[in-house]
Each structure stands twice: as C-alpha cells, then as structure tokens.
C-alpha cells in the first residue's frame, strides 16, 4: 500500500481492491468458460472460491510489505504498525468475502448442489 496516503485511504482501497479482484476475475473467468463451452455459472463460483486468497494478496500490495511492517513492529517495538497492518488485512478479507457473497448471490450455485 502507498505509505504517503493516509491510513483510512489505504483501508478503503484495500477493501475495494480485494472486492474488484474477486468479482472481476470470477466474471472474466466465467466469460472464458462460456467461450470454451463449459457452464459459466459453475466456473464463476469455482473461480470465486479460488481467487479469495489472491484478492487478499493483491489488496495488501504483496506479502513483503506486510512482512516488513510486522518485522518493524516486532523488532523496533512499533506496535502501531502491526495494528495498522492487521486492520488492512482484515479490510482486504472483508472485501474478498463481500465479493464472494455477491458472486454467490448472483450465481445461486449453492442452491443446485
């Protein structure tokens, strides 16, 4: 995440980046499944389940920034950075879960299983 921007900006961006990665990736993947002759709604649901972790990684800006923040918080005693990073991860998890829920509502795939 951008260190120059304020924390709330990064917090909101983290949520919506994860949401966009999950919804966009699943819908574009569903289009690819349709073009390949596979059932698109099933493919969208499967992709949404698989993309959750990647939406989280994309939203927090890669794993090295998070690891560096944790390292700085632990080794330098800067617990504020650890708390901020945890909040950013929770925000990204919320965005990914919201995206998965929207996909679940749109496809209604859980009703046919």
From Swiss-Prot:
Entry's transmembrane regions: 16-36, 51-71, 86-106
Disrupted-gene phenotype: Impaired ability to form spores when associated with a ytrI deletion. In combination with a ybaN deletion, cells show a severe sporulation defect.
GO biological process, alphabetically ordered: sporulation resulting in formation of a cellular spore
Keyword Oxidoreductase on entry: no
Pfam families xref list: Spore_YtrH
Location of the protein in the cell: Forespore outer membrane
Keyword annotations from UniProtKB, A to Z: Membrane, Sporulation, Transmembrane, Transmembrane helix
Induction / repression: Transcriptionally regulated by sigma-E.
Membrane topology: Multi-pass membrane protein
One GO CC annotation: membrane
Purpose of the protein: Involved in sporulation. May contribute to cortex formation or stability.
Protein name per the record: Sporulation membrane protein YtrH
Source organism (scientific name): Bacillus subtilis (strain 168)
Lineage: Bacteria, Bacillati, Bacillota, Bacilli, Bacillales
Gene transcribed to yield this protein: ytrH
């Amino acid at each position: 995440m951008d260190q120059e921007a304020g924390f709330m900006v990064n917090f909101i961006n983290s949520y919506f980046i994860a949401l966009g990665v999950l919804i966009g990736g699943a819908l574009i993947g569903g289009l690819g499944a349709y073009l390949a002759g596979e059932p698109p709604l099933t493919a969208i649901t499967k992709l949404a389940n698989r993309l959750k972790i990647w939406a989280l990684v994309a939203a927090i800006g890669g794993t090295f920034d998070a690891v560096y923040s944790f390292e700085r918080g632990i080794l330098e005693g800067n617990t504020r950075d650890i708390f901020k990073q945890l909040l950013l991860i929770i925000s990204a998890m919320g965005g990914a879960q919201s995206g998965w829920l929207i996909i679940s509502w749109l496809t209604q795939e859980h009703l046919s299983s």
